Every structure is written in C-alpha cells, then in structure tokens.
A protein has these predicted regions:
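Substrate-gating cap/lid region and adjacent catalytic-acid/histidine neighborhood
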Residues: 1-140, 152
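Polar low-complexity intrinsically disordered regions enriched in Ser/Thr and small residues
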Residues: 19, 163-166, 200
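Non-catalytic, well-ordered alpha-helical segments in soluble enzyme domains
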Residues: 142-163
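Mature extracytoplasmic/periplasmic domains
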Residues: 159-187
Length: 201
C-alpha cells in the first residue's frame, strides 16, 4: 500500500530490470525448448493484450521460438512491466526516479541465457570473479560494464543521483546497460504500450 500511496515520494530510487528476466527459469533446465506454439498463444490470450502482440513478441529474438516469446511475455508480466509502471507512477507525482534496463547478453548455457534474472547482480556489485557468478556470466563477463554499473550505483548511494537523466513521462529516459551503455528515450516502447492499462499486483 505504501508504494501505491507514494509514502516514499521524497526518497530517490533506482528502478529497473533485465531485458529477459524469465530466461533464468526457462533456459537452464531446457523448459524453453519444450514450449509449443499453442502454449504461447494461450498465455497471450490470458494476458489480454492488443492484437499486434504476436508480432511484437515475434521480434524479441531473431527467429524467435515459442519458448523465446513466452519467456519475453513472462519477463514483461512478472518483472519488467511492474517495475516500469512503478517508475511511471513515481514520475507522475514528481518523485526522484531513475530508470534502467540491463541488456547485456550472457553467453551462459550455450549462449542462450541472455539478459536473464540475476545476470545483472555481479555487474552491480563488481563481483565478476566470484565463483557464484560464473555460471550466469558464461565466462569472465565484461569488466568495463561492471566498472560502469558499479560506478553509477556507488554514486547513487553517495549522492542520491546515479549520474544519468532523471526519469520523466515526456521522454522516458532510461539507461540501457550493455557493452556500450547509453541513455535511450523510451526503449522497448512497443512492449510497454502492449501493457498500457493492465493492472499489476
């Protein structure tokens, strides 16, 4: 309740997610390869999205499989869009908010893990060399990205400002963390628009 009532309005906040959160739960055990087209179609129908949703999700990866598309749909419904909506709600009441997306593609699990849930954690804390991070990084990782993310998070902790444009509803400036990180206006807008008006718990 405190989140929706903006009891935290004065507190600066970083809000974001990885691009492909749900792949952590679908790639390592091979579930992503067992998803048939009807399963994705059923999930899409239950979500009640706009008629162009199949075309939007077909673009999430080159030659996207039903499993790829379902992973993207689940990433949006359970992680990305709730975070996005929270950032939107904070921006609407003037709460200091900075939005980010983690886009770096992990080569883990045969190059299929991608920008999955938890892949961003060793980058934020600059712990790429840890034994726990190795399976998710699929190798040594990309140290310049870790330096960049850790630097922004450290600055935020010290100053309350991570060092990129504050989020607003006019241009939706969002830091995209990747091998080349940059602030982008309203990235993945087509997927955000699919979920406009949907409620999240």
């Amino acid at each position: 309740a405190s989140l929706t009532q903006h009891a935290d309005k004065a507190i600066p906040l970083l809000v974001g997610s990885t691009d492909e959160e749900a792949r952590l739960y679908m790639v390592p055990g091979g579930a992503i390869d067992r998803i048939a087209a009807p399963a994705f179609a059923g999930a899409l129908e239950r979500a009640g999205l706009a008629p162009n949703a199949p075309n939007v999700y077909a673009q999430v990866r080159p030659n996207a499989s039903p499993g790829d598309m379902l992973a993207a749909l689940e990433s949006d419904s359970t992680f990305r869009m709730p975070a996005q909506r929270y950032a939107d709600n904070r921006a609407a009441v003037g709460a200091p908010t900075w939005n980010y997306q983690f886009a770096w593609q992990s080569p883990g699990f045969g190059g299929r893990l991608g920008a999955a849930h938890v892949v961003d954690v060793p980058y934020v804390f600059n712990t790429l060399a840890s034994k726990q991070a190795s399976p998710f990084l699929g190798g040594q990782g990309h140290q310049p990205l870790a330096d960049t993310m850790f630097g922004h998070w450290l600055r935020f902790v010290k100053t309350g400002d991570p060092g990129w444009a504050r989020y607003d509803l006019a241009t939706r400036p969002t830091m995209r963390f990747d091998t080349r990180s940059a602030v982008v206006a309203d990235p993945l807008a087509d997927r955000r628009q699919l979920w406009a008006g949907k409620k999240f718990n």
